[in-house]
Amino acid sequence: MARKCVVTGRQTRSGNQRSHAMNSNKRNWKANVQKVRIMVDGKPKKVYVSARALKSGKVERV
């Protein structure tokens, strides 16, 4: 399964890593997603949720 938050849609982003000489290398920044149990349509379900969504209270654990 992809590293994607089902609440906020946060996922892996790509970009350049720059050295002091400004050489560029491609790299990825991965979202901090955790597998948690939440209520989905009245039933508990395990889904991937970002840590930011958990901290801000957008979802509540079961």
UniProtKB/Swiss-Prot annotation:
One of its GO terms (cellular component) is ribosome. Residues 1-27 are annotated as: Disordered. Gene3D superfamilies: Ribosomal protein L28/L24 (2.30.170.40). This is Large ribosomal subunit protein bL28. Belongs to the bacterial ribosomal protein bL28 family. One of its GO terms (biological process) is translation. It comes from Oceanobacillus iheyensis (strain DSM 14371 / CIP 107618 / JCM 11309 / KCTC 3954 / HTE831). Residues 9-26 have a biased composition (Polar residues). Keywords: Ribonucleoprotein, Ribosomal protein. One of its GO terms (molecular function) is structural constituent of ribosome. It comes from the Bacteria.
